[in-house]
Amino acid sequence: MTGKLYGNKDNFRTQKVLIAAKLANKTVTLAGDAAPADKFPLGVTPAFEGDALLFGAESIGLHLTGTSANAETVQWLQFAEGYLLPAVLGYVLPSVSAANFDKKTVEQYKNELNGQLQVLDRVLVKKTYLVGERLSLADVSVALDLLPAFQYVLDANARKSIVNVTRWFRTVVNQPAVKEVLGEVSLASSVAQFNQAKFTELSAKVAKSAPKAEKPKKEAKPAAAAAQPEDDEPKEEKSKDPFQDMPKGTFVLDNFKRSYSNEDTATKAIPHFWENFDADNWSIWKCEYKYPEDLTLAFMSCNLINGMYQRLEKLKKNAFASMILFGTDNNSTISGIWVWKGDKLAFELSPDWQVDYESYTWTKLDAKSDATKKEVNEYLMWEGDFGGKKFNQGKIFK
């Protein structure tokens, strides 16, 4: 089998395919960074043109390796792309100044990645490779998704707690088929740090290189259509903001969010919250996950929170939350503190928000109570006794 591959040769996704081709003894030739639009209208790379037209590193890799890939391999591809890679990029990109830096968000991704690596480390205690006794597409996919982390943020100190993952990673990247594509891989000697000047410079380069959208040419309207009153055209009805009719109040949520993101939580953000919170027009709620017995691995439990946040995106304008996973793998709980406008359950205001909330019990807290203030402060800082529960990791909705 021979074929053309479209994609940046230095991109880890393209490199996955090049390595898979070598493992399968297939000939794949790089044909440029961009895929031809007539054959790949979605514009996704890497893209493969050969005995089939395919896009995406995993699908192309599976196609090239053929029958050597089994269900066990596929599960690792899904783990790498669905769970591991988002945490890697969420931690690495801001650290190398390729994305804007928000301390708490980066800390979330760092904790999530560390949790996943601890699980993977236990899997690899007695294994040389992920599937079988030889290098496979599973190893290539997981290792390449971890490559940015090992290059930029997993320094010697971080690697001490994941000795099995590090040993396995070194084994994979030093295999001839992998080394031929990647060259010599150097591991991070220190954790990359965000640099505002570098971020500004990189952002300017990206903006400059972005293709400018062409303005559509205006076509002359037929006389009959031009004479038709504009009011006859159907107008798209805007959905009403569920919070629209509520009193505005004095608490400016965006100001608190900025303080929480950019200033010290204990000395700045928390005092700002309590000095400005408007208990007459806003409320504080605590939630507890109803089914802790169903929670297994920590990173999978965190994805429950991530999914909930994604589905509640439109609620962000009028809400803030700190959700925390407590405990360890197969022995954990989830609870959180939420703040939103109004004194009723916000989820009941819109059908779009009634997806996850029924999996939690909700308790309205007394904003004037010292006990409430203590608990809210703990959830904002991710520090405290938490009623005896052991903090694992937290996620912020803002």
Swiss-Prot record:
UniProt keywords, alphabetically: Elongation factor, Protein biosynthesis
Domain EF-1-gamma C-terminal: from-to ranges: 239-398
Signal peptide start-end: none
PTM comment: AMPylated by fic-1.
Pfam family, one: EF1G
Phenotype upon gene inactivation: RNAi-mediated knockdown results in 100% sterility at 25 degrees Celsius.
Bias (Basic and acidic residues) ranges: 211-221
UniProt domain GST C-terminal: residue ranges: 66-199
A single BP term in Gene Ontology: translational elongation
Intrachain disulfide bonds: none
PROSITE patterns: EF1G_C, GST_CTER
Protein biosynthesis is among the record's keywords: yes
Single Gene Ontology MF annotation: translation elongation factor activity
Span list, region Disordered: 210-248
rRNA-binding as UniProt keyword: no
InterPro entries tied to this protein: EF-GSTs (IPR050802), EF1B_G_C (IPR001662), EF1B_G_C_sf (IPR036433), Glutathione-S-Trfase_C-like (IPR010987), Glutathione-S-Trfase_C_sf (IPR036282), GST_C (IPR004046)
Gene Ontology annotations for the cellular component aspect, listed alphabetically: cytoplasm; nucleus
Subunit structure and binding partners: EF-1 is composed of four subunits: alpha, beta, delta, and gamma.
Function: Probably plays a role in anchoring the complex to other cellular components.
Protein name: Probable elongation factor 1-gamma
Lineage per the UniProt record: Eukaryota, Metazoa, Ecdysozoa, Nematoda, Chromadorea
